[in-house]
Amino acid sequence: MKRRDLIKTLTLLPLAGSFPIDSLFATPVAGNNVPFNMQNKPMPDLHRKAFVMDGHTHVMTRELLMGTDIGQRYTDGNVDLPRAKEGGVDAMFFSVYTPEHYYPGRFETKNTFRVVNLALDQIKKNHSQIELALNASDIQRINKKGKMAAFLDLEGPWDMDGDINLLRALHRLGLRSIQLPAHNTTNAFIDTCNDVSRWGGINDLGRKIIREMNELGMVINIAHASNDAILQSVEASKHPLIYSHGGFYGIVPHPRCITDEAAKSLAAKGGVIGIHFGSLFNNPIYWKWQQGQKKSNETKPGTVQAAPLKTIEEVDKEVLKEVPLSFRGTIPEEYWMHVDQLAKVIDYGVQLVGEDHMALGSDLDGGPELPREIKDISDYPQMTMAMQRLGYSDTRIKKILGLNWLRVIREVTGN
């Protein structure tokens, strides 16, 4: 089937300058003395009763390439439904991910649709544990049943050219959130943070896509976008946007981290920032060491842009070598972050933009160098306890754990 015929068919488908940055890692943290027992994991009553939602988890790459089942407990990786239940996680932005490997051969559209289809199949297969959510009311209804609510979020391009007909087809399939950037590669309408600037932010096509997503009631995710692209996307949208997973540039000057300027702009529009769980974006000591090693923990444009492989199956074999996704390698003991240090990053955001605009976007199974107290999603209560040690009120913690995500979804998608 020709590309244009495929498209036609698919469209017919029913500045925190006052914050003491140095204090993040210059003094001992409570985490150094926290009892740590992976077999006897504590869960505060607050965490058990709260609505908990993760803004970014990689959950389908393994299932696509290895034929596994998210409803079963894995012996490796970070995320599956049994462990999510143990961690008290009620809902997740399920990342439907297309990595850069698929771009040279222009397989990004095919991969996107097959991963979305797989996600729907996995949800149906495990219907006793999980349901697809299209809006905030769905999430709350599913949560009351004691099931996981899956809110699909696209990471990577549905089409490098930004075909709006394909966007509409994905909406009909149940996709309600899309990251505008093509991961770390600039596409036809928006600049990414790790690639060359082609558009000075976003272009007219990017603004047209934003208007379309506003009309469809789709959440606009600007993680991986350049600073100018974030600012311009916020200005172009009539709805709040999200930055699903990352850190603050004011703490770690990694291009993937959001600047204070962009964070304030996003919050002023009602948006939410999800804090990534990895050391690379949150631990300045680790960042300096990693820079000294002259290694990168992020896929760079060009590293997978060599001669394209002939078939999508050949690309699958290359991606499979990296599953479960991991960029962390070996972390020297002195650079291994504690969960209390991650909580201080959250507090940086609270001081900068307020408690109504902060949340969690772990990137579990996406490769982060996790804090030493967090092995997988079952350890999510560690985040609640770390925020309690900061002296946060129950109300503030509940917002950060999930209510802020729920608010944005309600405002964007309606009921």
Language-model segments: what does each one mean?
Residues 5-197, 249, 253-415:
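N-terminal hydrophobic targeting/anchoring segments and the immediately downstream early-domain regions
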Residues 163-167, 226-238:
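Distinct, well-ordered alpha-helical segments
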Residues 199-208:
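Active-site glycine-rich loop that binds ribose-phosphate moieties when present
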Residues 211-222, 228-232, 262-268:
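Substrate-binding cleft of carbohydrate-active enzyme catalytic domains
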Residues 222-223, 245:
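Short His-Asn-centered micro-motif
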Residues 240-246:
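Short hydrophobic/aromatic-enriched beta-strand-loop microsegments
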